Amino acid sequence: MSYIIKEIEEAWQIKENILHDSSKLIKLKKILNESIASLNQGIIRVCEKQGNQWKVNEWVKKAILLYFITTESQLYNNNYNSWYDKVAPKFPADTDKNIFKEAAIRKVPGAIVRTGTYIAKNVVIMPSFINIGAYIDEGTMIDTWATIGSCAQIGKNCHISGGAGIGGVLEPLQAKPVIIEDNCFVGARSEIAEGVIVEEGSVISMGVFIGSSTKIVYRDTGEIIYGRIPAYSVVVPGILPPPEVGKPGLYCVVIVKQVDKTTRGKVSINDLLR
């Protein structure tokens, strides 16, 4: 892997001219195809947890961006649609059923998954869109019309509900993607973007919008934080009162409670929201 990283870093330095050097281009394409295949298999990933911190592997982002630069668009078809793109589908129309059986995943009509995406065992993909570089861990459901952006990281046993959006990021290189840790629920039509981290066991109610500048308010203390939903939080949309009467209030999200693993195991997600 160190050889691949070295080659990608060197190619990145000359990316503006790489298309004009045919010998380097042929060599680079082979390396990039290996990198995309490794993303597909979960061997490498854009972001990974080391201890309690998430670390961005910038070279993987560079590999994806170089793949876009060096790949020409082509026509793709399945039984009911055609499209013209630089990125092939992860599951083309002629995918053998044994591939799905061995992977232990379920994918229904209308689900679009680009290559360079890792889909772990027992994942269910309803009609939705999952972009290149995304990582979907075991037992997660991507529900109808949800979108998973490029490089987004979704943990084990999560439920990304209907119409929810999980933002993606390829640039800037050092920026973290949106990260949804294990055992999280993201409610319908919610949007999590701009590198926000939703920590393990959290429940995001329907219609919650969280970006890097969104105020996240603890209801019991009034403390305000940004960019991170603490583990085992239950979050609903809210509004902060204006400083002066007659002025508009501002949108925020509210941590209404935090529960431990024991409590969460005894109640359903709907009970927690209520």
UniProtKB/Swiss-Prot annotation:
What is the designated name of this protein? 2,3,4,5-tetrahydropyridine-2,6-dicarboxylate N-succinyltransferase
Q: What is its quaternary makeup?
A: Homotrimer.
Q: Which Gene3D superfamilies match?
A: Hexapeptide repeat proteins, Tetrahydrodipicolinate-N-succinyltransferase, N-terminal domain
For this protein's source organism, the top of the classification is: Bacteria, Pseudomonadati, Pseudomonadota, Alphaproteobacteria, Rickettsiales
Keyword set includes Translocase: no
Which gene holds the coding sequence for this protein? dapD
Per the UniProt record, the source organism is Rickettsia prowazekii (strain Madrid E)
Q: Name one GO cellular component term.
A: cytoplasm
Q: In which pathway does it act?
A: Amino-acid biosynthesis; L-lysine biosynthesis via DAP pathway; LL-2,6-diaminopimelate from (S)-tetrahydrodipicolinate (succinylase route): step 1/3
Give the main location.
cytoplasm
Positions annotated to bind substrate: 106, 143
Q: Which GO terms describe its biological process?
A: diaminopimelate biosynthetic process; lysine biosynthetic process via diaminopimelate
